[in-house]
Swiss-Prot record:
It comes from Marinobacter nauticus (strain ATCC 700491 / DSM 11845 / VT8). CDD domains: NT_ClassII-CCAase. It catalyses: a tRNA precursor + 2 CTP + ATP = a tRNA with a 3' CCA end + 3 diphosphate; a tRNA with a 3' CCA end + 2 CTP + ATP = a tRNA with a 3' CCACCA end + 3 diphosphate. Keywords: ATP-binding, Magnesium, Metal-binding, Nucleotide-binding, Nucleotidyltransferase, RNA repair, RNA-binding, Transferase, tRNA processing. This is CCA-adding enzyme.
Amino acid sequence: MQTYLVGGAVRDKLLGLGVKDRDWVVVGATPEDMIQRGFKQVGADFPVFLHPDTGEEYALARTERKQGRGYHGFSVYSAPDVSLEDDLRRRDLTINAMAETENGDLVDPFNGHADLEQKKLRHVSEAFAEDPLRILRTARFAARLQPLGFSICRETMALMRQMVTSGELGDLVPERVWQEVQRALHEQAPGVFFDVLRELGALQVLIPELTDEQPFRQGLSALQCIHRKQGSTAQHYAALLSGVPEPDAVARAKAMKSPNDCRELTHLVGLFMAQLNGASPETRLTPELAMELLDKADFWRRPDRFGVLLGTLACTLQSEPDHLIQQLELAAHRAQSVTPHPFLQKGIQGKALGEAIRKERVARITEALHLPE
């Protein structure tokens, strides 16, 4: 029974990056051997165990064979006779197919270290083509490592184009696609992820709304702005789709099974963009429009979300965003200062109360924006 550190931990250690998670492969053992040593089995599809002290994952060496289309179209073989090299061969990229012995010696049967030095992302074998999710993973690694000078080698780009042409990208379940997109949004250079997918023709399959040049470039520009501000996942995603018409953007967010906060913010950004982009700075925000937007954003019950929305709009609006954001903030602040109490004291109730509050809010917004009533 031999234990090896594998994958990302070895890669990041060689790159001089901080190692966050450590994964291990065990060769020459059975599930019973692991359980006898106090490990807890957690893997449903293949034998993965948690270390009794560290909680780190230890997987028995395994091979995978393609048997059908889609994520579940693989048969897994795990037994004591599976070698370390067999296990590493099933991995996606050579830089992820290295291992380290318990003595710290590097095991590198597929020249991953050389590719690290040459800053190349290269597939381990033709078996790469068996899993279409690897297209997204490779694009995501490009987004992570491009600032360090890495690029995808030509042979791997060619193989991925063939995979896109085969149509298997359409077999990926939305949850798996979203998982990769969500991770990519927070990589070092998230725009690279979408650039790679577009070059491969994969974006046409996964997010066809971004195929055209204008929404794609606008989305990437807004995405880079949000990324510099270290925005949330919802802000990143809404920024990415900010050049897409609101109904189409929301439909894509739903189809991709993104979380509710992503869908809601995508919807609001689309609404505000449609109302505020294009018109002159003097005419595009009237008190009535400000009230309408505050209502649509549910500002009265969710003021914190409105702040998130404004932070996103600061990156998505095409002209004079700072001035417009300041106006919206001021309008919201002044409108929020109106309370029912003075009207209730005057005996105003029911529908008349709501109308009186709204009228006063519009008046205060008008005053705040220095507009004639």
